[in-house]
UniProtKB/Swiss-Prot annotation:
The protein's name: Putative multidrug resistance protein MdtD
Pfam families documented for this protein: MFS_1
Localization, UniProt: Cell inner membrane
Sequence intervals crossing the membrane: 12-32, 49-69, 77-97, 102-124, 138-158, 165-185, 197-217, 225-245, 263-283, 286-306, 342-362, 396-416, 431-451
The keyword Cell membrane is annotated on this UniProt entry: yes
NCBIfam families, A to Z: efflux_EmrB, PRK10504.1
Cytoplasmic-facing ranges: 33-48, 98-101, 159-164, 218-224, 284-285, 363-395, 452-471
Membrane disposition: Multi-pass membrane protein
Gene3D superfamilies recorded: MFS general substrate transporter like domains, Multidrug resistance protein D
Cellular component, GO annotation: plasma membrane
Periplasmic-side positions: 1-11, 70-76, 125-137, 186-196, 246-262, 307-341, 417-430
Keywords, alphabetical: Cell inner membrane, Cell membrane, Membrane, Transmembrane, Transmembrane helix, Transport
Species per Swiss-Prot/TrEMBL record: Escherichia coli O139:H28 (strain E24377A / ETEC)
PROSITE patterns with a match to the protein in the record: MFS (PS50850)
């Protein structure tokens, strides 16, 4: 990229900065949840909604981000995304109740939903096609550093300052990023077709109310009648979307996507698989602090081996899949992740803390292999005219399933535990043990889906073409 103009390189730095902000925020909050609960006077068992409110909002808003960027301009939307994300961070820091914090996190999620896809779109428009892969590698690298720094930085700020600072640090960075965007980024627009507002609203309502219903009485205190009503509304909304999308060329997501068998299996497996793996980043730091008495900073440091294992495995995942095939790799990594989850619980409860970094490193390796394989299996056989729509649907499903996973983890803690959990309590460790056992079972279930994948090793070369677009 050395032959790119200085203005283009600065624009790539702005996009990279947005990727870093978004990825850092997805992990920095996890280690702060017990401290937030204490400060806000809430049970730690309710704090999963701090993550769910953000991730679910991202899932709901993702389908609109690309259309908005084409219609209004990439600079205007990227600037708006940074401003909303920064304002959300400010309101998070000022929150005095859990409900205020959830609303602020939702505002953050609106900004986060637009930041990454619009950033990708910006790179496509400002960089020559032959340099696109190198440019995307450059801008996504900070996004890989964010999860590495997030848990430890969050723990450090909580331990030596307060949880408010995990949001306050976004404000000066966001102001600088917003000014740089206005000054340096071009405002590319494109001719757009009419946005499928009806389909968007139906999907948004379906996803939101079903997730809220899943949290149910344990998380939100809803009555059984209200939960039943939410389930009915959610199911009706999704059925109406299917009827709306039938034979509709302007539908948000075409049902023609599901004529490709690998897409259908990959999407179903990705949805089920990420429900299980989405529990781990939430449960691990909470368990280390509440169940084992680790400090926030120590718990954050323990998450680093998992990220390192994930980053290291990405270098060889193509060769692994090409050698063994999708079916073997996905079934093995799904069952392997379930076993590693049980191994983590066992070593932790036995007090073998020195083994935990190695277990978490292994967990990161297995999870990374499964993620990359799921992503590329889903997209590799789609025709070119459906690839963009399929990628957008996969991105939405990834966020939705992670929010459901965190919701289920919080629900399991609520089912097995009391309203208040104390550190070093034998009862607390029993609650976490039952929760981890249930999680291991949920993580293993998608193996039944992946067992139906054709083991067509000779087609796996497509992973190298699709890998980056799916991440």
């Amino acid at each position: 990229m050395t032959d790119l103009p200085d203005s283009t390189r600065w624009q790539l730095w702005i996009v990279a900065f947005g990727f870093f902000m978004q990825s850092l925020d997805t992990t920095i909050v996890n280690t702060a949840l017990p401290s937030m609960a204490q400060s806000l006077g809430e049970s730690p068992l309710h704090m999963h909604m701090v993550i769910v409110s953000y991730v679910l909002t991202v899932a709901v808003m993702l389908p609109a981000s690309g259309w908005l960027a084409d219609k209004v301009g990439v600079r205007n939307i990227f600037f708006t995304a940074i401003v909303l994300f920064t304002l959300g961070s400010l309101f998070c820091a000022l929150s005095g109740t859990l409900n205020e914090l959830l609303l602020a996190r939702a505002l953050q999620g609106v900004g986060g939903a637009m930041m990454v896809p619009v950033g990708r779109l910006t790179v496509m428009k400002i960089v020559p096609r032959e340099q696109y892969m190198a440019a995307m590698t450059f801008v996504t690298l900070p996004g890989q550093v964010g999860p590495l720094l997030g848990p430890a930085l969050g723990g450090l700020l909580v331990e030596y300052a307060s949880w408010h600072w995990i949001f306050l640090i976004n404000i000066p960075v966001g102001i600088i990023g917003a000014i740089a965007t206005l000054m340096l980024m071009p405002n590319y627009t494109m001719q757009t077709r009419r946005f499928d507002l009806s389909g968007f609203l139906l999907l948004a309502v379906g996803m939101a109310v079903l997730t809220l219903a899943l949290d149910g009485s344990k998380g939100t205190g809803l009555s059984p009648l209200t939960i039943a009503g939410l389930v009915a509304v959610g199911v009706v909304a999704l059925v109406l979307y299917l009827l709306h999308a039938r034979n509709n060329n302007r539908a948000l997501f075409s049902l023609k996507l599901f004529r490709t068998r690998t897409f259908s299996l990959g999407l179903a497996g990705s949805f089920a698989g990420r429900i299980g793996s989405g529990m781990l980043p939430f449960m691990t730091p909470v368990f280390l602090q509440i169940g084992l008495g680790f400090s926030p900073f120590h718990a954050g440091l323990m998450m680093i081996p998992m990220v390192l294992g994930s980053m290291g495995m990405k270098r060889i995942v193509v060769q692994v899949v090409n050698c063994f095939g999708y079916r073997r790799v996905l079934v093995a990594t799904t069952l392997g992740l379930s076993l590693v989850t049980l191994l983590f619980m066992t070593t932790a409860l036995l007090g073998w803390y020195y083994v935990l970094p190695f277990v978490l490193f292994l967990q990161g390796m297995v999870n990374s292999t499964r993620f990359s394989s799921m992503n590329t299996l889903t997209l590799k056989d789609l025709p070119d005219n459906l690839a963009s729509s399929g990628n957008s649907l996969l991105s939405m499903i990834m966020q939705l399933s992670m929010s459901i996973g965190v919701t289920i983890a919080g629900l399991l803690l609520g089912l097995f535990g009391s309203q208040h959990v104390s550190v070093d309590s034998g009862t607390t460790q029993t609650v976490f043990m039952y929760t981890w056992l249930s999680m291991a079972l949920i993580i293993a279930l998608p193996a039944f889906i992946f067992a139906r994948v054709p083991n067509d090793t000779h087609q796996n070369v497509a992973i190298s073409r699709r890998k980056r677009s799916a991440q």
